[in-house]
Curated annotation (Swiss-Prot):
Keyword annotations from UniProtKB, A to Z: Oxidoreductase, Pyridoxal phosphate
CDD domains hit by this protein: GDC-P
Source organism superkingdom: Bacteria
Protein name: Glycine dehydrogenase (decarboxylating)
Residues bearing the modification N6-(pyridoxal phosphate)lysine: K709
Native source organism of the sequence: Gluconobacter oxydans (strain 621H)
Length: 951
């Protein structure tokens, strides 16, 4: 090689480019796609799509992209700065054993983690069954009639229980009582939730401080945060006598041995299923639960799986009672819950299927026995054990020696809980060993103590309370007995996965949901113990890796969005909305503007927006949209004038839910600011802005970022999610974690999935992120252009282009021949596709978002399917086929249809193979569901199907 060769060419360039794998269309296809959409280049497309006033192509400071290998090495280096000690901190978070068969075949399986929320039930039967197992598990443990399919975490579940108690209780009081022996993070979340709604939170001893006539409900801890187990029956009876509601915060492992809340008289039971096989993960994600009485089912928050029947009369699962939810009831919804924790609920349910009732009893009994031995040994050493009746946790008064005890425990590799005032808490779990117990004894005894004699002399009795042992049978349904060998369980999980459609099989073109690639490299770090086995309240000097990770994400999210500060605490987009509105509320109140309580929300907004505004104590005022789907600026001006001096905020989604960049967004922001309000820009559609526009620089004051959309955390069949918020510097003092504001139980929300988004940003870099946004916009316009001659595209921007999604109008087809959006959605299943978003934001339409990850071949396959369906509708329009005889009305077609008697007006091939015979064809496991029948005959736990259907 010549010696004078320029040094820049000495070393060969990297051959790996992650962005080219993340982005679907190949460079050779882009020219044809641009020709179809009518743009001369990608830059031309962006110039004609994004308003010039906000377009920003400059580098955002993210830096150059890393390869997958380099990004994983960087994350490994970050993880190595976390110290994995044995955690006995407790406080609602415990070490646990995730069975490897569940880790590999659920948590690490894209058939499970890339699925969407099961709103299309026919293609979601597998995860619906797993979630029904979860509901059955919770209902059994709690002894209550009905349980939901998960909430975000225990703290928010308790806040939801408070809200439910206020809705269903007979008391007219405005105060809610909280047991002082409740986890402190839960109390903080409850206080945050209550304050904007005008409810007082009274914290005290329920046996001495509770005046049942002065509260609408009470939260009792069972067991308490200290570990103490108290019989709540007298307190519950006193509450009921005054028309108040009794809620119990429970430990689901303790409920294996303790009497169920339902048997004790409780109306609501809540808790976290984390210790059923889900790692602590520095706070999450974990599936919380709520169970309640049948009478309250229509007021319960969160998703609810029920049993219905399909078109052949066979049992099938679906999401039930959806009229409770935010996407329908908006500000009148029971909650703003949207994303829940489906994947984690499924893991917890499989943990119960794996162990069965006998295994759970053995784990619970061993855990209690370890705690009893620990307590007895400490008493022998002369320690003052405050907790006398307990399941797994004890509290010791160590006085002035507490710091030394805690330090000696850390030196031996164990974290105990500093409970304050010289008190030390310690919790046992299924991973606790005799060596752990001995090390704790040694921490209390000090150096040189001989513990062998103590161990030999111990006479340990159980410390479970008399009269509170579980009396009801546990987990009697066959599903908790039928899959006990690993072979059987493996095949059961595979059979469930095969029933569903997820991103590993097909495009999921759901508008406003951003179902993009969840790259395998991004997922790998979440199971590393340095991320997974960290307690959220571990000492700061042990979690320097997480501190570095949080700082990286806060910096890059600020750079991407143009904001000045970020909070990572909200663990869903809806929680992010709520947190952002609380920040706005705090800002106004600090300035003496308590009267600012009006939240302006466009008619096209996500259902979570009005629900979140109501939770933040604001009044929702709807702003009209014009015929082009944009905010009607004249109506906005009128509403501002009508509510002069009271405007707190506007919540606006950008690009709009109609799939266009509104040209007047800067003017809208200026109008609201001139009226003294703040601009909440919903980040649900941020995938159309990253690298090309920054909300914080064109007028917005706060946004949430759906990390499970734009930044590649998978949807998990309905969760987990993350919804961090970015704010301008004037709102930074009011972020969660400051001034006592807590919207989630853990300080950094679902911290263990943050490496996914960090890896994505690292591997894309500035240019890759910009390319991803550009290609998302190209893909949406390509679909709009290909479908335009067959279905009207409802909204386009000023220059005739859509943003990252498009809306096709199907209403005229219903008017003409009676074909519904459901008919087309179900017919798409026969073509192997998940339907787009149905009837939102406009009834009778599809909202289609392909994302940047889908290649031209898959886009064409989808468009070909939609065009073929339009041809079938044309047959009905021409009178050659009656609508009731059309394959559209019988879709989806099942293997039972194919093999059974065929008395239909079209051929088997036309019905079952609309795209031609395909050896890899997806078959719906059930026919079309009868939704109304399912709500009329509600069953939300594993039923005896045969008798149920006959009945």
């Amino acid at each position: 090689m010549p010696e004078n060769l320029p040094v820049t060419t000495l070393w060969p360039a990297q051959t790996e480019d992650f962005s080219s794998r993340h982005i679907g269309p190949r460079p050779s296809e882009i020219g044809e796609m641009l020709r179809v959409v009518g743009a001369s280049s990608l830059d031309d497309l962006i110039d004609k799509t994004i308003p010039a006033a906000i377009l920003d192509r400059g580098d955002h400071g993210i830096g150059a992209a890393l390869t997958e290998q380099d990004a994983l090495a960087r994350l490994r280096q970050i993880a190595s700065r976390n110290q994995v000690l044995t955690s006995m901190i407790g406080q609602g978070y415990y070490d646990t054993v995730l069975p490897p068969v569940i880790q590999r075949n659920i948590l690490e399986n894209p058939a499970w983690y890339t699925a969407y929320t099961p709103y299309q039930p026919e293609i979601s039967q597998g995860r619906l069954e797993a979630l029904l197992n979860f509901q059955t598990l919770v209902a059994d443990l709690t002894g209550l009639d009905i349980a939901n399919a998960s909430l975000l975490d225990e703290g928010t579940a308790c806040a939801e229980a408070m809200a439910l108690a206020q809705r269903v209780g007979k008391s007219k009081a405005t105060a809610f009582f909280v047991d002082a022996d409740t986890h402190p993070q839960t109390i903080a979340v409850i206080r945050t939730r209550a304050e904007p709604l005008g409810w007082d939170v009274v914290v005290g001893d329920p046996e001495t401080d509770l005046d049942a006539s002065s509260v609408f409900g009470a939260l009792l801890s069972y067991p308490g945060s200290s570990g103490q187990v108290r019989d709540p029956r007298k307190v519950i009876a006193a509450l009921h006598e005054k028309g108040a509601i009794a809620a119990l915060a429970c430990d689901p492992l303790a409920l294996v041995l303790l009497e169920s809340p339902g048997a004790l008289g409780a109306d609501i039971a809540i808790g976290s299923m984390q210790r059923y096989g889900v790692p602590m993960g520095a706070g999450g994600p974990h599936a919380a639960f709520m169970a309640t009485r049948d009478a309250f089912k229509r007021h319960m928050p969160g998703r609810l799986v029920g049993v219905s029947r399909d078109s052949a009369g066979k049992p099938a699962y679906r999401l039930a009672l959806q009229t409770r939810e935010q996407h329908i009831r908006r500000e009148k919804a029971t909650s703003n819950i949207c994303t829940a924790q489906a994947l984690l609920a499924i893991i917890a349910s499989m943990y119960a299927v794996y162990h069965g009732p006998e295994g759970l009893k053995a784990i619970a009994a061993r855990t209690h026995r370890m705690a009893a031995i620990l307590s007895a040994g400490l008493k022998t050493l002369g320690a003052t054990v405050e907790t006398d009746v307990f399941f797994d946790t004890i509290t010791v008064q160590a006085g002035a020696s507490a710091p030394q005890v805690l330090a000696r425990a850390v030196a031996s590799g164990i974290n105990l809980r500093d409970a304050g005032d010289g008190r030390i808490g310690m919790s046992c779990d299924e991973t606790t060993t005799p060596e752990t117990i001995r090390a704790v004894w040694a921490a209390f005894a000090g150096e040189g103590a001989d513990l062998s004699a103590i161990e030999q002399a111990l006479d340990v009795a159980d410390a479970l309370p008399e009269g509170l042992s579980r009396t009801a049978p546990l987990l009697t349904h066959p599903v908790f007995h039928a899959h006990r060998s690993e072979t059987d369980l493996l095949r059961y999980m595979r059979a469930l996965a095969d029933k569903d459609l997820a991103l590993d099989r097909t495009m999921i073109p759901l508008g406003s949901c951003t179902m993009k690639l969840n790259a395998t490299a991004e997922m790998i770090p979440i199971t590393w113990p340095e991320f997974a086995r960290i307690h959220p309240f571990a000492p700061a000097d042990q979690v320097q890796g997480y501190t570095e990770l949080f700082a990286y994400l806060e910096r890059t999210l600020c750079a991407i969005s143009g904001y000045d500060a970020v909070s990572l605490q909200p663990n869903s987009g809806a929680q992010g909305e709520y947190a952002g509105l609380l920040a706005i509320r705090g800002y106004h109140r600090a300035r003496g503007d308590e009267n600012r309580d009006v939240c302006l929300i466009p008619a096209s907004a996500h259902g979570t927006n009005p629900a979140s505004a109501q939770m933040a104590g604001m009044r929702v005022v709807v702003v009209a949209c014009d015929e082009n789907g944009n905010v009607d600026v004249e109506d906005l001006k009128a509403k501002i004038a009508q509510h002069d001096g009271r405007v707190a905020a506007i919540m606006i989604t950008y690009p709009s839910t109609h799939g266009v960049f509104e040209e007047r967004i800067v003017e809208i922001c200026e109008l609201v600011h001139a009226a003294g309000g703040q601009v909440y820009l919903d980040g649900a559609n941020l995938n159309a802005q990253v690298g090309l526009a920054r909300p914080g620089l064109y007028g917005a004051d706060v946004s949430h970022f759906n990390l499970h959309k734009t930044f590649c955390i998978p949807h998990g069949g309905g969760g987990p999610g993350m919804g961090p918020i970015g704010v301008g510097k004037h709102l930074a003092p009011y972020l969660p974690g400051r001034h006592g504001i807590a919207v989630s139980a853990a300080p950094f929300g679902s911290a263990s999935i943050l490496p996914i988004s960090a890896a994505y940003i690292m591997m894309m870099g500035d240019e890759g992120l910009r390319q991803a946004t550009t290609m998302a916009i190209l893909n949406a316009n390509y679909i709009a252009s290909r479908l335009e001659g067959h279905y009207p595209v409802l909204y386009r921007g000023t220059n005739g282009f859509t943003a990252h999604e498009c809306i096709v109008d199907l209403r005229s087809l219903k008017d003409a021949v009676g074909v519904t959006v459901d008919d087309i959605a179900k017919r798409l299943i026969d073509h192997g596709f998940h339907a787009p978003t149905v009837s939102f934001p406009v009834a009778g339409t599809f909202m289609i978002e392909p994302t940047e990850s889908e290649g031209k071949g898959e886009l064409d396959r989808f468009c070909d399917a939609m065009i073929a369906i339009r041809a079938e509708i044309a047959e009905v329009e021409a009178g050659r086929v009656g609508m009731e005889d059309s394959p559209l009305r019988f879709a989806p077609h099942t293997t039972a249809d194919l093999a059974g008697d065929w008395e239909r007006s079209y051929s088997r091939e036309a019905g079952c193979f609309p795209g031609g015979v395909d050896t890899a064809k997806y078959w719906s496991p059930v026919g079309r569901l009868d939704n109304a029948w399912g709500d009329r005959n509600l069953v939300c736990s594993c039923p005896d199907i045969s008798t149920y259907v006959e009945g």
